[in-house]
C-alpha cells in the first residue's frame, strides 16, 4: 500500500510541471464563468442580491458544460498511466502490482481533486456577491423558478432541482455522481492505454462525452441509461425509483446509476490488473 501511494504521489508531483493541468484549470474557470456564473453575477448585481454558494449542482444541467466537463476529464487522464524515462526504475523498485495500484489510486484521487476544483471555483467566481445561506437564496431561486434569467440574461436554471432537493442534498448527490463518472472516464482511459495506443482511449472517451448531447436530442430516454455524462445532471436522474409516476420515471433511477457506474469502475480495475500481469512496462504506449 505504501509503494502504491508513493507512485500515486509521484504522479501528482508532475502536475506542477505539466502545462496540461493549467490548461484544464483555465478551461474550468472560463467554461463555468462564461456559460453560467457571469450571468448569475450580473443578475445579482442588477437586483442588489447575494448569491448562495450552491451553483455547483446546476452546472451539468447545461449540456455544453456537462459535455466539456467530460472532455476536461479526458484531457486530464489522456496520458494515464504516466510513463516517462524514469518509469522503468520506479516500476522495478515498487513492483508490478504496486505500480499499477498507484496509477489506479491516482485516477480515483485526481477525479476527486477535479470535482473539488469545480466546486471551489463555482463559489470563488461569485465572491463579490457571495451570500452564505442554507437555502437556495433569492438569486438562484428566482432564476430557477421564473423566466427572467432567460429573457434578460440568457440563462435558465433548473426549477426541478430547486423543487426536488435541498441545497445540501443536491450538492452531496451531484458531487458523488460527478466524482464517480470522472473516475469512470479516467479508469477507461487508463485501462485502454495499458493495452492499446492512447488515441483509442481518447476516441472512446470522446464518444462517451458526445452521448449526452445525443441523448438530449434523441427521441426517448434509452440513451440516458448508457450515457455516464448524463448521470451527472440531476434533471435526468429519477431519485424516487419505482414510486415515481411522473415523467421522471422514464429516466434511470439512482440505484441503477450507482450500481452500474460502480460495476463498470470495478470491472475496469479488475481488467487492468488481470491484463497487466505479464505485460512489459516497455511496451506501454506514450502516444
Q: What do the predicted segments below correspond to?
A:
Residues 1-27:
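Aromatic- and glycine-rich beta-strand/loop motifs that create alpha-glucan
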Residues 8-12, 16, 97-109:
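Interfacial transmembrane-helix starts/ends
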Residues 19, 95-97, 197-203:
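Membrane-helix interface segments
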Residues 24-29, 200-213, 231, 286-287:
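Central hydrophobic cores of alpha-helical transmembrane segments
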Residues 32-80, 101-190, 194, 227-260:
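Secretory targeting signals
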Residues 35, 196-226:
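Transmembrane helix segments
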Residues 76-92, 96:
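Transmembrane helix boundary and interhelical loop/hinge segments in multi-pass membrane proteins
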Residues 191, 195, 262-287:
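Junction motif at the cytosolic side of a transmembrane helix
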Amino acid at each position: 500500500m505504501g509503494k502504491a501511494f508513493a507512485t500515486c504521489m509521484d504522479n501528482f508531483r508532475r502536475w506542477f510541471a505539466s502545462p496540461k493541468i493549467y490548461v484544464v484549470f483555465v478551461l474550468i474557470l472560463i467554461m463555468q464563468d462564461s456559460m453560467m456564473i457571469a450571468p448569475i453575477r450580473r443578475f445579482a448585481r442588477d437586483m442588489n442580491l447575494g448569491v448562495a454558494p450552491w451553483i455547483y449542482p446546476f452546472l451539468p444541467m447545461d449540456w455544453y458544460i456537462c459535455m466539456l466537463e467530460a472532455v476536461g476529464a479526458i484531457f486530464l487522464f489522456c496520458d494515464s498511466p504516466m510513463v516517462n524515462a524514469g518509469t522503468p526504475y520506479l516500476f522495478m523498485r515498487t513492483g508490478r502490482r504496486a505500480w499499477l495500484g498507484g496509477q489506479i489510486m491516482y485516477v480515483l484521487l485526481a477525479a476527486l481533486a477535479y470535482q473539488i476544483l469545480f466546486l471551489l471555483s463555482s463559489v470563488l467566481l461569485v465572491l463579490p456577491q457571495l451570500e452564505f445561506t442554507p437555502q437556495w437564496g433569492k438569486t438562484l431561486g428566482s432564476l430557477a423558478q421564473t423566466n427572467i434569467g432567460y429573457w434578460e440574461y440568457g440563462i435558465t436554471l433548473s426549477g426541478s432541482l430547486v423543487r426536488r432537493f435541498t441545497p445540501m442534498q443536491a450538492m452531496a448527490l451531484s458531487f458523488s455522481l460527478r466524482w464517480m463518472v470522472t473516475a469512470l472516464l479516467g479508469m477507461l482511459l487508463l485501462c485502454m492505454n495499458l493495452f492499446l495506443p492512447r488515441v483509442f482511449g481518447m476516441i472512446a472517451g470522446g464518444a462517451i462525452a458526445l452521448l449526452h448531447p445525443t441523448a438530449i436530442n434523441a427521441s426517448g430516454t434509452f440513451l440516458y441509461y448508457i450515457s455516464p455524462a448524463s448521470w451527472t445532471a440531476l434533471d435526468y436522474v429519477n431519485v424516487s425509483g419505482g414510486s415515481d409516476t411522473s415523467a421522471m420515471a422514464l429516466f434511470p433511477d439512482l440505484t441503477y446509476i450507482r450500481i452500474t457506474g460502480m460495476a463498470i469502475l470495478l470491472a475496469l480495475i479488475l481488467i487492468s490488473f488481470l491484463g497487466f500481469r505479464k505485460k512489459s512496462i516497455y511496451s506501454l504506449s506514450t502516444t
